[in-house]
Amino acid sequence: MKKIKKLIIACDGEAASGKSTGAKLLSKKYNLLLINSGLFYRYSSKKIIEKKPKNIINFLKKELNSISYKKISKQKLHSEAISNHVAVLAKNKKVRQIINQLQMKIIKANKRICVEGRDIASKILVKNPKYDVAFYFKCDLKVAAYRRWLDLKKSVSLKEVKKSLSLRTKI
């Protein structure tokens, strides 16, 4: 079978719906670079929580410009505090623009890539470059809450996780 030279796969969907699992399987099967766009928001939230900058826009421009995706992906970014902060941060239009520009830079630099994240197919990879294949993941709230609760190693109650996901799904 001939290897496809250019392939952009987008895995979009709701919080805790299985996007990451699906994207990992696809990137492994087709030997693609895997980018989890949510990690940019999680990393940004972690740094904002730690450093408490006065101007988050300038802070994030500098912070995200000076770190590689590889380093971001190795951080511990799945805590309830970070998840709750991401829900607020993701509503900031300027923050989304900064993170989207960074994602586009990475995507344009790689011909074979699988990008996973909310709005990646519906708003981000709609042109230049546009995805070749897109998947949308949807999951029942009870199942999504249980999946996230397991990810959090049961450190918070299932009820709290369900409430948090319910709020995040509305973003």
Model regions and ranges:
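Phosphate-binding P-loop
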Residues: 1-6
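ATP-dependent small-molecule kinase phosphotransfer cores
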Residues: 39-113, 119-125, 142-146, 159, ...
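Glycine-rich phosphate-binding loops of nucleotide-dependent enzymes
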Residues: 126, 134-148, 152
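Hydrophobic anchor at the beta1->P-loop junction of P-loop NTPases
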Residues: 9-11
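Post-Walker A helix-loop "phosphate-sensing" segment adjacent to the P-loop in P-loop NTPases
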Residues: 27-37, 50-53
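Walker A/P-loop
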Residues: 20
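ATP-binding Walker
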Residues: 14-17
